[in-house]
UniProtKB/Swiss-Prot annotation:
Stretches that traverse the bilayer: 5-25
Keyword Transcription attached: no
GO CC annotations on file: plasma membrane
Annotated family: Belongs to the UPF0154 family.
Record key words, sorted: Membrane, Transmembrane, Transmembrane helix
Keyword Signal recorded: no
Protein name: UPF0154 protein SAG1601
Pfam families in UniProt: UPF0154
Membrane topology: Single-pass membrane protein
């Protein structure tokens, strides 16, 4: 084969690997954020305290569940 064909094959392979890697990384990040949101119950409790609310455990857990539920539905509807 000529050198031009080899160069084209290498460029196509690199481009395909780049595109495939981006999609795989994106899926993994979406899955990780869906399973483990960045806001934890402790962070929610702290935010409620800073806003002047007295954070009861039931309210903190309810807010946390709503955040997790919203994140999962956002990922599902985006597909």
């Amino acid at each position: 084969m000529s050198i031009t064909i080899w160069i084209l094959l290498i460029i196509v392979a690199l481009f395909g690997g780049l595109v495939g890697g981006i999609f795989i990384a994106r899926k993994q990040i979406e899955k990780e954020i869906g399973e483990h949101p960045r806001l934890t119950p402790d962070a929610i409790r702290e935010m409620m305290s800073q806003m002047g609310q007295k954070p009861s455990e039931a309210k903190v857990q309810q807010t946390y569940r709503n955040i997790v539920k919203h994140a999962k539905t956002a990922i599902k509807t985006k597909k």
